[in-house]
A protein has these predicted regions:
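Domain-level signature for proteins that mediate thiol-based redox and metal-cofactor handling
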Residues: 1-81
Length: 81
């Protein structure tokens, strides 16, 4: 399942990288929760991010085919260091 979710994330990666960030799949809870990590680079444009609730909805819609029981996507921002 992780490989399939990583492939979905790949489609979003260029947009995040354009703003100095990266994105990856974090924790996967089979009960229906996926963690998506937003990795903030040193020159990241934090103001460029859409609101987290909209981002979670966007990822959830894209990931539902892989994990039909998906209830929630948690967005976690990580800064280097």
């Amino acid at each position: 399942m992780r490989e399939e979710l990583d492939k979905i994330i790949e489609g979003f990666r260029p947009g995040f990288q354009a703003d100095g960030m990266d994105v990856s799949v974090g924790r996967i809870d089979p009960a229906g929760v996926i963690e998506v990590k937003i990795l903030m680079g040193p020159n990241a444009c934090e103001e460029c991010l859409i609101p987290e609730n909209l981002m979670a909805d966007m990822f959830r819609a894209a990931m539902r085919d892989v994990m039909p029981a998906l209830e929630r996507v948690d967005i976690v921002r990580e800064k280097p260091g």
